[in-house]
Design a protein with these regions (language model features):
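Glycine-/small-residue-enriched transmembrane alpha-helix faces in small-molecule transporters
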Residues: 1-43, 94, 145-155, 163-193, ...
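Helix-helix packing/entry segments at the starts of transmembrane helices
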Residues: 16-17, 43, 103-110, 194-211, ...
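Specific transmembrane alpha-helical segments of multi-pass solute transporters/efflux pumps
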Residues: 19, 60-108, 156, 243-261
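Hydrophobic/small/kink-forming positions within alpha-helical transmembrane segments
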Residues: 21, 25, 82-86, 90, ...
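Transmembrane alpha-helices of multi-pass small-molecule transport proteins
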Residues: 35-87, 114-119, 149, 179-187, ...
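Specific alpha-helical transmembrane segments that line the substrate/conduction pathway
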Residues: 39, 46, 93-141, 264-286
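C-terminal-most transmembrane helix of multi-pass membrane proteins
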Residues: 45, 266, 270-315
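Loop-to-transmembrane alpha-helix entry segments
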Residues: 105-108, 124-156, 170-171, 261, ...
Length: 315
């Protein structure tokens, strides 16, 4: 039984990585088409709210508990939802204006490093003397060598791009992606203590709802600056929201829930997300005609993927 569950979880994890990778490719497609990056960043989440609401209705998950949980810690929900979603996605689409999608996907793996380093900011439930307590998480020291490997892999891919984009573009993109890589795990980790009673889909819906006013204001700014988005931008951002924001999220949560009883198997399923980079490269080659600038980038990708897999397996 466990073997069949693991096989199912493995396939779901791989599919989730594929749907997650679509984000990086479509962002590059929109950039090439001249779509304004602020529209690209806001429309995904404007689409996601009704899509997630529809999903909750299909799955018959109640909505009232979501509002009760948000109301009980409104300030925290607004703050960390905006950091985790707005602070994550806007810098990512901004960087996609200057760098190819596969490279954005590669640099984005820095979020694994910052996810581990921000562990002490999270409190996890533990039983102490027969009573439940929230205990501050610790940085798993066994992961540190593999975090260095990931950083080296990212560095090689970035160095390989030097000379193909202007230095200031590379620098500002790297800074933006670094900020996004910190904001995403930090926002999500700080929300977790307030979302203990919610399912994964309910939590994503709640965070999207709390960040929605910000995305609406940003879309108004985009409208005033460049006018309404094109039909192509609307369609592409819809597919990004559907693919990455809904389908991939649901698949990944389902995959992890199947093996949640075994931390070793859970780590192996989480390691499938290293395939985001692989799928981004393959899709870039097939649909965008992307090529590597030099062998440093190939080496960097190999090191990066190896590091991502090992940091999960060694937890």
């Amino acid at each position: 039984m466990y073997k069949s569950q693991f096989t199912q979880a493995l396939l779901l994890g791989i599919l989730a990585a594929l749907f997650f990778s679509v984000t990086f490719i479509l962002n590059q497609v929109m950039n090439v088409a001249g779509s304004y990056w602020l529209w690209n960043g806001t429309l995904r989440y404007l689409w996601m709210l009704p899509l997630l609401l529809l999903l909750l209705m299909i799955q018959r998950q109640p909505i009232k508990p979501i509002y009760r949980v948000i109301k009980s810690n409104l300030g925290a929900w607004i703050l960390w939802s905006n950091l985790g979603f707005v602070g994550f996605y806007l810098p990512l689409v901004f960087a996609a204006d200057y760098l190819p999608g596969w490279l954005v996907s590669s640099i984005w793996q820095l979020t694994i490093i910052f996810g581990v380093l921000t562990s002490p900011l999270t409190k996890i439930p533990q039983m102490i003397d027969g009573k439940p307590h929230l205990v501050r998480a610790k940085i798993p020291l066994v992961s540190l060598p593999w975090l260095v490997i990931i950083a080296i892999g990212v560095a090689f891919t970035v160095v390989g791009e030097h000379g193909h984009v202007r230095p200031w573009e590379l620098t500002i993109s790297l800074l933006a992606l670094t900020f996004a890589a910190i904001a995403y795990p930090l926002g999500n980790r700080k929300i977790m203590p307030h979302a203990q009673t919610l399912t994964g889909v309910q939590r994503v819906f709640a965070m999207t709802l709390c960040a929605y006013p910000t995305f609406l204001m940003l879309s108004l700014i985009a409208l005033l600056q460049v006018g309404p988005p094109s039909a192509e931008t609307l369609l592409n951002t819809f597919f990004v929201g559907l693919s990455s924001g809904v389908i991939a999220t649901v698949l990944f949560y389902k995959a992890t829930s199947l093996v949640a009883h075994d931390m070793r198997l859970l780590a192996q399923i989480e390691a499938t997300q290293a395939l985001e980079v692989v799928f981004s490269v393959i899709l870039s080659f097939i649909f965008l005609g992307t090529t590597f600038s030099n062998s440093w980038q190939i080496l960097g990708l190999i090191i990066l993927i190896f590091g991502v897999i090992m940091v999960n397996l060694r937890r």
